[in-house]
Amino acid sequence: MLSCTTSTMPGMICKNSDLEFDSLKPCFYPEDDDIYFGGRNSTPPGEDIWKKFELLPTPRLSPGRALAEDSLEPANWATEMLLPEADLWSNPAEEEDIFGLKGLSGSSSNPVVLQDCMWSGFSSREKPETVVSEKLPGGCGSLAVGAGTLVPGAAAATSAGHARSGTAGVGRRKAAWLTELSHLDSECVDSAVIFPANKRESMPVATIPASAGAAISLGDHQGLSSSLEDFLSNSGYVEEGGEEIYVVMLGETQFSKTVTKLPTAAHSENAALTPECAQSGELILKRSDLIQEQHNYAAPPLPYAEDARPLKKPRSQDPLGPLKCVLRPKAPRLRSRSNSDLEDIERRRNHNRMERQRRDIMRSSFLNLRDLVPELVHNEKAAKVVILKKATEYIHTLQTDESKLLVEREKLYERKQQLLEKIKQSAVC
């Protein structure tokens, strides 16, 4: 829970923990039982969701970080409580890059970049008032962005002054910042400024005047350093000697870029600036290829130049030689396969020829057998089974007739022998 310094009583710092609930009581629903039944002091949860989450603007650079950079003194308890969670745990530039709030400074007249959407300490029945347009003290450097130009902040100019001021200046800045923050509690910001996702408009592009050169506050460029380094790594190449410079701004769904031609006089002025300004000027992208957004698949594709497309290398005919060598070992295999096929075809052809010869011989034998059977001599349409059956019966009859003839032959032979003996006896007598 946030500290009681963000309550409806500006300028008051509560050190008693029992008074925190009293100061933050307007943030909660009434304690009546009829909260959802139209009580006297109740508000339906769906009446206006933006009234439940009223917004309080916070500076782009947190007070704890700004004071820690200037002095070696540890921040007090009030500064630690007022420090947003985004500054405590992560880089605010990365958080702005995730929620798409980095391009918010170019679309609104508010110089304060809003970070914490849930920092609210006043009643839900109060209407949001106008956007805070007044700047914070010089200790917190900010980048005031107009409709078309970038105004350099005070962080780069006052960095040397902070080193010379000492602890007395730090105490004055703390008190001034807390006083200014207490006066900002009574005002809130419209939700359309915080969540521009519903607006599908391209963000205005900020340009750098030639007279100003690259004199942009270092604190503002630190938020863009991470994304610019990613773009430099993703881009193809960077030319060192060109005069055309790409200034890239992170918008809602795509990157808007402008080409600003800086004369040689601007380069001479940049050479005379402080090392901090020179370091911030180096962060500006020089002449490079078109930058494509990597993970935004919903964004329309960027137009590509025909020269940027990689040309396909023509296929050379040199690899054909090794391919022929690779195909050569397959030739014997094809020959063996063709030989085996020819052998199979020849074998089948011989088998068919022998089968036809066997069938012809069998047919001729059946026809001859049919002619030998007396009953089937004139029957040309006799079946093979009938021919075989009748031939078998005829053979049996022939065998019986043969046996009878053999018996008769034996009888005749015996008769012959008897007659020869009678002739011999008659001759002796």
Curated annotation (Swiss-Prot):
List the record's Gene Ontology CC terms alphabetically: nucleus
Annotated GO molecular function terms are: DNA-binding transcription factor activity, RNA polymerase II-specific; protein dimerization activity; RNA polymerase II cis-regulatory region sequence-specific DNA binding
* GO BP annotations, alphabetical order: apoptotic process; regulation of transcription by RNA polymerase II
The segments labelled Leucine-zipper in the record are: 398-419
Give coiled-coil spans as residue ranges: none
- Where is it located? Nucleus
Q: Which UniProt keywords apply?
A: Apoptosis, DNA-binding, Nucleus, Phosphoprotein
From the UniProt entry, list the residue stretches annotated as the region Disordered.
301-325
Query: What is the protein name for this chain?
Result: Protein S-Myc
Q: Please name the SMART domains in this protein's record.
A: HLH (SM00353)
Q: Which residues carry this modification: Phosphotyrosine?
A: Y36
From which domain of life does this come? Answer: Eukaryota
Kindly state the subunit structure of this protein. Answer: Efficient DNA binding requires dimerization with another bHLH protein.
| Its job | Has apoptosis-inducing activity.
- Protein encoded by which gene: Mycs
